[in-house]
Amino acid sequence: MAFRIEHLADCPEHLARVAAWQHTEFGYLNPSIRLEQREERLRASLSATGLPLTLVAVSDDGDPIGAATLLPRTITHPHLTPWLSTVVVPPACRGQGIASALSLRIALEAARLGFPMVYLFTPHNASLYRRAGWETVEMAELNGAPVTIMVRSTSV
């Protein structure tokens, strides 16, 4: 499947769908966050000039098929910055390199903003990120769920 990666600021019509995907995929990690709050957080990334920054993978037909956000910090490790967050690809679109392409583009965006490294945590996709050049930093817990903290250089 052919796709391009755009800043959410350039395709804000996809904001509600991306928020719904994030809520469905990651809501269990922080159940107190409502869908409306996710939408509000995404609205903060409608400027492509700094953080937060959200990227959307868009098919040639114009449909969103994945998204990822670059955040300045995370609740578990506020001393590390920035963070690749909420990478989500709908089940029907998985296995086509979309998540890997999004994570690479996030690293490039972090480099553009002057960051030498970018971090992430993942509850269940560490092997996918290892194949894309990420290294494990440590194992941690987020609201009782085990997560892998990973890092990669932004010089790709």
Would you name each region that the model predicts?
Residues F26-S59, T69:
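Active-site rim helix/loop that mediates acceptor-substrate recognition in acyltransferases
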Residues L15-F26:
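Hydrophobic alpha-helical core bundles mediating ligand binding, dimerization, or RNAP-core interactions
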Residues R112, P116, P123-P146:
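Conserved active-site alpha-helix within GNAT-family acetyltransferase domains
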Residues V87, V118-L120:
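Conserved hydrophobic beta-strand within the GNAT/NAT acetyltransferase core sheet
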Residues T86-V89, G95-L108:
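Conserved acetyl-CoA-binding loop-helix of GNAT-fold acetyltransferases
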Residues M1-R17, V156:
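Conserved N-terminal entry element of GNAT/NAT acetyltransferase domains
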Residues T54-V56, D63-P72, T81-W83, V88:
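Conserved beta-strand in the GNAT
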Residues P52, A145-M150:
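Short hydrophobic/aromatic beta-strand or adjacent loop that forms the aromatic wall/cage
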